[in-house]
Design a protein with these regions (language model features):
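Short glycine-/aliphatic-rich beta-strand segments at the starts of folded cytosolic domains
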Residues: 2-16
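A broad, low-specificity signal marking well-ordered, structured residues that form hydrophobic/aromatic
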Residues: 3, 50, 95
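Short amphipathic alpha-helical segments
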Residues: 13-38
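Short, glycine- and small/hydrophobic-rich beta-strand elements in well-ordered beta-sheets
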Residues: 29-51, 55-57
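An amphipathic, aromatic/His-enriched active-site/gating alpha helix that lines ligand/cofactor pockets
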Residues: 35, 56-94
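Glycine-rich beta-strand-turn "strand-cap" elements at beta-sheet edges
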Residues: 45, 77-142
Length: 142
């Protein structure tokens, strides 16, 4: 599954946030991978808006696996002061963002359609096979 989330970094602490993420602890990287976090990226807007993206089999399970690691506890404690909404630990204060479009999913769905695309004539209500309509138009133009 694909997961997108957002949070907020204090704008005055963005440079420190970037610096810490430029050299994430190797044991934290390994823990994320071992917990099932794949293709994980963070994006930081100029106003402190943080967008995260990851792929995993089961987000709640991947998050739960991270929650029990010692390194995650240390990392979250180090990062907590950088977040604007610091009532919760940083890894629990994410707002999940709904995915509304994915190119590959829609292309795969379109490729799996076996029947020609059909539309309904607005005047007569008749079903029109667009492949047949295109063929008839080509014959008329010849």
């Amino acid at each position: 599954m694909r997961v997108c989330f957002r949070s907020s970094v204090h704008p005055e602490l963005m440079a420190e946030y970037k610096q810490r993420h430029a050299a994430v602890w190797p044991e934290m990287l390994k823990a994320l991978k071992d917990a099932g976090w794949n293709n994980y990226s963070l994006f930081l807007a100029p106003d402190g808006q943080l967008i995260g993206y990851l792929e995993c089999e089961d987000y709640k399970a991947a998050q739960a696996r991270m929650a029990v690691t010692e390194v995650n506890g240390r990392w979250q404690a180090e990062m907590a002061t950088l977040f604007a909404n610091s009532d919760l630990p940083p890894d629990q204060g994410f707002e999940i963002v709904e995915e509304v479009f994915n190119l590959e999913d829609q292309l795969a769905a379109a490729d799996s359609v076996k029947e020609p695309y059909a539309v309904t004539d607005a005047v007569t209500g008749a079903h029109i096979n667009t492949d047949s309509a295109a063929h008839e138009y080509q014959k008329e133009q010849a």
